[in-house]
Amino acid sequence: SGHRKFELLMEDLRNAKESIHMEYFYFRQDQGSKQIKEMLMQKAREGVKVRFIHENIANIVIRPKYYNEMKKAGVEVEKFTKPRWPLVNLVTQLNYRDHRKIVVIDGRIGYTGGMNISDDYFVRWRDTHMRITGNAVAGLQYSFLNSWITADGEVDNDFTKYFPMCKEDESSEPAMDTTA
C-alpha cells in the first residue's frame, strides 16, 4: 500500500549514511511529499550526498522556490526535461520525459515501481512498488546516474562508492533491471 511504502521509505531515508539518489516523475506538494522533502534536506545538512531528479513538465505547477529551498539545504536538484524554445523544439521534447520512480540509499537499498511521491497513493490510487536490497540495487543506481548525467548533474570521478559490494547476508539472487 502507499502507506507501507511511505513508512519504509521514510525509515530508510532516516537511516541513510552516505548517499540518497531519488528520481521521480511526479512529486506533489502535499503532506507526505513535504515530509520527504524535509527528510532529504535534513540528511543533506547532516552531510549525506543527496541528489534529486524531477521531471519538469509533470511538475510544472511547482514553483522554483520549492526546489530552491532544497538546494539551499544542500540537496542537489536537477530537472530531467528542460524545455527549450523555440516552440518547435518544445514540441519535440514533450515525448522525451522521465517516467522513472527510483530511490537508491547508500547503494544498498533501492525502491522502484509505479508509485510517485503523492498522498493520492494513500487513498485513491493503487500501484505496485518494490523495496530491493542486494546486487539488484546496482541496476537502479546505474539507471539513476545515467539520468543524472543526462539532466546535466555533476558526478564524482570515483563511482565505486555508489556501487558497494553486497555483504554475504544480503540477497545475491539474480535480477534484471530493465531501464527504459
Feature map (PLM): residue ranges:
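Charged, low-complexity intrinsically disordered terminal segments
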Residues: S1-A180
